[in-house]
């Protein structure tokens, strides 16, 4: 009885490790994709808002790449 319990726990542990390894080496998760798209949208909005006041595109891009925290 005790050995079957140990083997069951070992199988669960191995399944957990395999799932984590596959998720790291595989495609990005949905949250990572959404986070990247949200960051890209924030950057585009920042550049567009900056260009309304400043004609220099390069300065706006640099300012939006390294935003100053509030």
UniProtKB/Swiss-Prot annotation:
Tissues expressing this chain: Expressed by the venom gland.
Keyword Transmembrane: no
Superkingdom per UniProt: Eukaryota
Cleavable signal peptide: 1-26
Localisation per UniProt entry: Secreted
UniProt miscellaneous comment: Negative results: has no effect on other potassium channels, on sodium channels, on bacterial growth and on smooth muscle tissue (a known assay to identify possible bradykinin-potentiating peptides).
Domain notes: Has the structural arrangement of two alpha-helices stabilized by disulfide bonds (CSalpha/alpha 2(S-S)).
Name assigned to this protein: Potassium channel toxin kappa-KTx 2.5
Origin species: Opisthacanthus cayaporum
